Amino acid sequence: MLWPCLLALLLSQLNFLCAARPGPGPNFLLIMADDLGIGDLGCYGNRTLRTPHIDRLALEGVKLTQHLAAAPLCTPSRAAFLTGRYPVRSGMASHGRLGVFLFSASSGGLPPNEVTFAKLLKGQGYTTGLVGKWHLGLSCQAASDFCHHPGRHGFDRFLGTPTTNLRDCKPGGGTVFGSAQQVFVVLPMNILGAVLLAMALARWAGLARPPGWVFGVTVAAMAAVGGAYVAFLYHFRPANCFLMADFTITQQPTDYKGLTQRLASEAGDFLRRNRDTPFLLFLSFMHVHTAHFANPEFAGQSLHGAYGDAVEEMDWAVGQVLATLDKLGLANNTLVYLTSDHGAHVEELGPNGERHGGSNGIYRGGKANTWEGGIRVPGLVRWPGVIVPGQEVEEPTSNMDVFPTVARLAGAELPTDRVIDGRDLMPLLLGHVQHSEHEFLFHYCNAYLSAVAWRPHNSSSVWKAFYFTPNFDPPGSNGCFSTHVCMCHGHHVTHHDPPLLFDIARDPRERHPLTPETEPRHGEILRNMDAAARAHVATLEEAPNQLSMSNVAWKPWLQLCLPSKPHPLACRCAGDG
């Protein structure tokens, strides 16, 4: 039995060495889910959702059990994934309340001078494609400049949405502007209503006789506030929820019927068109972010409502794309990677109060915070004949690692004019090294350094120190339900001095902070981590803030519409799909 095992190992190493030579390397299929929790997949312990096709990747490849997103929100995490750099380096981390782009006509986005893995691979002769969600900006100064468009960042083909999927994009899905509604609608209406009532009572009691025009102005102000909000919600969907093929809008607003099937079909078409040339396909699902949707054959079929239906439909789509690889004879020369952009959104509730977020398994917290539930994500890597199937890697890894891994396998040189924070995964996946190359990882909440993780090579521990943590609301819960997601500053957080210390190798639930009494090296560990944090911060160079209020605000001159409806307020029309 020993000789077959040794022969298989030798062949895998020879295949890897051949693939690492200059020239065309393997093909790449990179799959990213949106808001998927690590506890939502069978291969990570879920027993009530059916994910056989994703689980197949775990059986036929490597399962990363401590795979971490570089940020707990969509936009910054995706920027880090594409560039291999912490999002704060590219200005893709917010200093304010809003950490993502909500409007298609915002001027912020992934800066044109950033290098993505798609750009690198184009230089190596690869054909590159993006199917699905982008969420990294569209235009800068004019609607037609497309400075942030996927096509400007190395993708030869783009079919999907330049923004994201939101509740407001689907009729009946509710709205993400509930908290804003309280500030900008309910509060002003209450104040104006109180003023109107006070004037009426004063007039009735004979205490004062306010002029009639004051009544008129107050009523007009109430009508203006209410009307503006209704108009905003009415036009938000067509203005921000649409599909593009390359640089052309094909459907506005997005029709969710058959959407996942269409994305899977486009992915299959891309594979067939490029079967004879090296390719990179980034399949970026709109599942399982709200608004939830599923075709009739999946709707109502899971044990977890609309969320579970979306997970199972996405798994079906993964299976369709993997089957296409098999039919084309491309599976053995294609590295497949699957992940989520961050943890599940635990505060996400449906219009009727039902749970619409996923599961982060045993891990605390979720989307928008740096507890493990917000940043620990699925990580599956398959490459038949090269990566030994059925492995588990427990070392800390990052979604930023995809950038240098893909670059090296494709024979591309990494940029030398900037810091690359990701590390090549292949030595770890092949068993050439036993420890992660990430001795330290830095966890940001927007642009603020929230926590540091340390994996010392002379220990089995993984230390994690929090400089601040979110204030869950209501207290004792596992999220920030009053604000829909946790905030990163001000009264929304609690700062810790000394930092809150955990050993997540022994306490992955982050329930038992260590103290000098429970950990004799407590002070030494924190000093080492603080020194690493200061050294890291010293490498940061100031970058224009792409998520400033001026950059995330809606700009009418950047609004795109179908050619038949050129005015920004007349975008409510469907294309041919």
Curated annotation (Swiss-Prot):
Top EC class for this record: hydrolase
Cofactor note: Binds 1 Ca(2+) ion per subunit.
Cystine pairings recorded for this chain: 140-147, 169-241, 445-488, 480-486, 561-571
Cofactor(s) required for function per UniProt: Ca(2+)
Entry annotated with the keyword Calcium: yes
Subcellular location: Microsome membrane; Endoplasmic reticulum membrane
GO molecular function: arylsulfatase activity; metal ion binding; steryl-sulfatase activity; sulfuric ester hydrolase activity
UniProt keyword NAD present: no
Residue ranges annotated as Cytoplasmic topological domain: 208-211
Signal peptide, first to last residue: 1-19
UniProt topological domain (Lumenal) ranges: 21-183, 234-577
Residues engaged in binding Ca(2+): 34-35, 74, 341-342
UniProt entry keywords in alphabetical sequence: Calcium, Disulfide bond, Endoplasmic reticulum, Glycoprotein, Hydrolase, Lipid metabolism, Membrane, Metal-binding, Microsome, Pregnancy, Signal, Steroid metabolism, Transmembrane, Transmembrane helix
Sugar attachment sites: 46, 332, 458
A cellular component term, taken from the record's GO annotations: nuclear envelope
EC number: 3.1.6.2
Family note: Belongs to the sulfatase family.
Chain's role: Catalyzes the conversion of sulfated steroid precursors, such as dehydroepiandrosterone sulfate (DHEA-S) and estrone sulfate to the free steroid.
Protein name: Steryl-sulfatase
Organism annotation: Rattus norvegicus
Lineage, opening ranks: Eukaryota, Metazoa, Chordata, Craniata, Vertebrata
